[in-house]
From Swiss-Prot:
Pfam families: Asp_decarbox (PF02261). Coiled coil: none annotated. Heterooctamer of four alpha and four beta subunits. It catalyses: L-aspartate + H(+) = beta-alanine + CO2. It comes from Psychromonas ingrahamii (strain DSM 17664 / CCUG 51855 / 37). Keywords: Autocatalytic cleavage, Cytoplasm, Decarboxylase, Lyase, Pantothenate biosynthesis, Pyruvate, Schiff base, Zymogen. Belongs to the PanD family. Its cofactor is pyruvate. Pathway: Cofactor biosynthesis; (R)-pantothenate biosynthesis; beta-alanine from L-aspartate: step 1/1. The modification Pyruvic acid (Ser) is found at S25. This is Aspartate 1-decarboxylase. It comes from the Bacteria. PANTHER family: ASPARTATE 1-DECARBOXYLASE.
Amino acid sequence: MKKTMLTGKLHQARVTHAELNYEGSCAIDQDLLEQAGILEYEQIEIYNIENGARFSTYAITGERGSKMISVNGAAARLAAVGDRVIICTYASLNAAEIVNHKPSLVYLDAQNNIVRTSKDVPVQVA
């Protein structure tokens, strides 16, 4: 049996552009894509912290070093410039793959600079 597991995450990314008339997708700074292990044209899930919207699209490469997070096409109706979003990727893994699996977690500041990276989500305490 396969389980769907988190593989990459950009946490609290800030939307820098919302381009309604662009073809679709989400353009992400190439440095951020690489740190999170997200591939160009890979399906991504975007969770908007500001309004609760959750939607799927695909990643395209944004200019390296630009700190760009550009939500494009119809999805631009679900995110505004300045919104904090969480961008995730997932994969279906079998039991043997899950044993050693660790996601690539990238935590960002308000300017989309990398604050830290991790392979583990901290334990939530009461």
